[in-house]
C-alpha cells in the first residue's frame, strides 16, 4: 500500500469516526472498490463532476456517512430516491450491512452502473429500480413500504417531500440532505401539512477537514399521505406544494 492510499484510508477512517462510525478493514476495502468503479465508469458516462480521490472520499463517502447517526435501528428498509451514482444509499449500506436498501433512479444507464457496484462489492439485500419517484410513489409495492427514505438531491424541499414521503410508513422518516441553506424549511410548511410530515430535527455541520456546510433535515411521517400524491410526473417540480 503506497503513501497516497494510506493517506486516503486515514481520511476515510477519521472522517467516518467524526460521525460515530468505526469502519473495519472489509468496509474500507468496499469503499475503495466503490471509488475505483466510480472512476472507471465516469470515463464513459457522466456520474460525478468530482474526480479527485480525496474529494470523492470527503464529498461523496463521508457526506453520505453523515446521516448514519440518524439511523438508530439497523434492521430497516431504506429507499434512496434519485440516488444518482449511489449516494447516500451505497455508503450507508456498507456501514450498515443489515439494512434492506432500494436505489431508485430515473436514468437506466445509472442503474446499470449501480448494479455493477453492487456485484463488485458483493452487497446483499440491495437492489435498483429504474423509475421516476412519481411513478413508484403510487405503486402499492413501494408506497408506504419503507422505514426511511433519503434524498441527496438538488430539488427544493417541498418537491423532495412530495417525491419521498409517499414511500415512508407512518412512524418512519424522510432524511433530506441539503447544502448550506435552511430557508427552504419555511417554504415547506404547506407540503408537510398536506403530505403528513413534520420536521423532527435539523442538523447543521461542516464536513470534516473542510468548511463545506451541510444541513440534514429529518422529517417524521405522522399520518398517511393522501392518495392523490405524488402527482403525475413533472407536476411536483413544476407546481411545488408551497
Curated annotation (Swiss-Prot):
Primary gene name: rsmG
Annotated source species: Acetivibrio thermocellus (strain ATCC 27405 / DSM 1237 / JCM 9322 / NBRC 103400 / NCIMB 10682 / NRRL B-4536 / VPI 7372) (Clostridium thermocellum)
Family label: Belongs to the methyltransferase superfamily. RNA methyltransferase RsmG family.
Protein's recorded name: Ribosomal RNA small subunit methyltransferase G
List of residues binding S-adenosyl-L-methionine: 82, 87, 133-134, 152
GO cellular component terms given for this protein: cytosol
NCBIfam families named among the record's database cross-references: rsmG_gidB
Class in the EC hierarchy, top level: transferase
Biological role stated in the UniProt entry: Specifically methylates the N7 position of a guanine in 16S rRNA.
MF annotations from Gene Ontology: rRNA (guanine-N7-)-methyltransferase activity
Amino acid at each position: 500500500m503506497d503513501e497516497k492510499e494510506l493517506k486516503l484510508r486515514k481520511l476515510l477512517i477519521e472522517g467516518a469516526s467524526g460521525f460515530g462510525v468505526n469502519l473495519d478493514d472489509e468496509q474500507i476495502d468496499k469503499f475503495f472498490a466503490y471509488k475505483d468503479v466510480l472512476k472507471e465508469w465516469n470515463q464513459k458516462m457522466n456520474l460525478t463532476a468530482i474526480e479527485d480521490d480525496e474529494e470523492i472520499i470527503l464529498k461523496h463517502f463521508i457526506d453520505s456517512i453523515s446521516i448514519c447517526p440518524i439511523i438508530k435501528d439497523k434492521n430497516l428498509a431504506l429507499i434512496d430516491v434519485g440516488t444518482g451514482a449511489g449516494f447516500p444509499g451505497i455508503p450507508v449500506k456498507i456501514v450498515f450491512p443489515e439494512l434492506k436498501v432500494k436505489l431508485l433512479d430515473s436514468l437506466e444507464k445509472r442503474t446499470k452502473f449501480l448494479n455493477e457496484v453492487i456485484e463488485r462489492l458483493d452487497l446483499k439485500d440491495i437492489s435498483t429500480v429504474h423509475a421516476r419517484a412519481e411513478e413508484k410513489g403510487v405503486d402499492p409495492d413501494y408506497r408506504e413500504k419503507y422505514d426511511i427514505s433519503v434524498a441527496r438531491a438538488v430539488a427544493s424541499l417541498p418537491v423532495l417531500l412530495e417525491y419521498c414521503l409517499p414511500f415512508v410508513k407512518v412512524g418512519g422518516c424522510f432524511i433530506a440532505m441539503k447544502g448550506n441553506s435552511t430557508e427552504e424549511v419555511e417554504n415547506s410548511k404547506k407540503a408537510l401539512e398536506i403530505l403528513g410530515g413534520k420536521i423532527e430535527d435539523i442538523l447543521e455541520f461542516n464536513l470534516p477537514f473542510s468548511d463545506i456546510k451541510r444541513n440534514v433535515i429529518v422529517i417524521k411521517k405522522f399520518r398517511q399521505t393522501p392518495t392523490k400524491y405524488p402527482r403525475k410526473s413533472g407536476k411536483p417540480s413544476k407546481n411545488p406544494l408551497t
